[in-house]
Amino acid sequence: RFPEADIKLEKLHRREKALYALFLLESASGGINFSKPTTPRQLAKYEKRMVAVQEKYKLIYKKFGGEPQNAPNLTMSEIRLPMIALIKKQLKALGEILFNVDDYMIQRNMFGNYCVNIHPSLCCFCGVNANDIYKLSDSEEWQKISAL
């Protein structure tokens, strides 16, 4: 039914799993731009947006079993970039298995936004029973996190 559903990314910690889930979530609205603007007005909007992104990340991090207050600070590139690199490395290792591995990669688009090229309607999760498969966008929890 889902040929790639049995694939499991190895050597990823909850921080990377939560980050990937965040990118899946944010890709539906164009991705996340971490570049700081130069004007004061744009900087204020950027900081507000980054607070919301960090809050979403904390909620997702908690879903993976982490303590929200211990979630890595994504605004710091020295923390975020190695996490993205590790996710990419693990995805590349599955290049022979995944149909089009580039679609799964976190990439910067022409606007400078980091996103994953998987349509939200194709993102699913299974419930308690492995046969219960739901679209991520239909999840109430996913919608609450997205609304922040």
Where are these regions (language model features)?
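Intrinsically disordered, low-complexity protein-interaction/activation regions
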Residues: 1-148
